[in-house]
Amino acid sequence: MIRRSVLALLAVAAMVMGCVVVASPAGAAIDTAVVVPSPNSGARSNVLKSVSCVSTTSCVAVGYYVGASAYQSLVLNWDGTSWTKVDSPNSGSNANVLNSVSCVTASSCVAVGWYVAESGTESQSLVLNWDGTRWTKADSPNPGASNNFLNSVSCVTASSCVAVGTYADDVQVSTSRSFVVNWDGTSWTKAESPNTGIYDNVLNSVSCVSESSCVAAGYYVNGAGTQSLVLKWDGTSWTKLDSPNSGSFSNIVSSVSCATGFSCLAVGRFDNGIGSVDQTLVLLLTGPEPPATTTTSSTTSTDPVAPAFTG
């Protein structure tokens, strides 16, 4: 009786203050890992490189398999019970590889990667769109004469996605430049992205929490070696964030994930300079949080603020 009275008083207090009391979600309760059967195409190598889930009964995994003469795109769908292979388009008869997938609903996914043109020498960006029924190839920019690779994609809505990677500079063909493309629901367009120095700049991963808040990460090469590379998007432009390096020679960021517009983690590896032994690298990216506001029953949520990371 006492407990019910206390709960009743709390409920009344919440209504008087115009606030909604919501129970906190339980912590992670995963305690078991099992191998789930998944289909393979042919008797040669099958590789899954990325997965995206929108519910326990809707996931998509992508990668590639080795066909009769070249790599072919590979897409599997999860329905809560089993994985099934889904037909996915391939451009030409040469290699087609999917590196990353991002879904916002069961009927809206984007997968990105690369394929080799019919000439057999130029790699082109590859983007596939899922509409809930089938995968179709989308037109995507290729700023370089060769080596146009998309390594990662992040979608916040069906009409807002960002994909990142690298392409070969037309002037210095052996030099890679940062590559960012945006999806607005209609077309993919190349965005201007900064490069550090005259040597390689490669983006391996991107994470968006809103249309105006994304972080991309990878590495660039200078005279001292390979350095961590972090770019941030504020809804208007991409800018480089000063990021630390643990190793004196090699620092590579392979993945980034943002929980909010002011809190991200980036991970990868660095060379400790002793016998070329790689060590784990973790970068905490933070920025000033927005001012606290009082939440009332009539308040509507807004997009997270653009990242203002301090390093």
Q: Where are the regions that the model predicts?
A:
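Residue-level hotspots at or immediately adjacent to binding/recognition sites across diverse folds
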Residues: 4-5, 19-291
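C-terminal cell-surface addressing/anchoring modules of secreted/extracellular proteins
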Residues: 291-311
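Bacterial N-terminal signal peptides
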Residues: 9-20
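Bacterial N-terminal signal peptides that target proteins for export
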Residues: 1-10
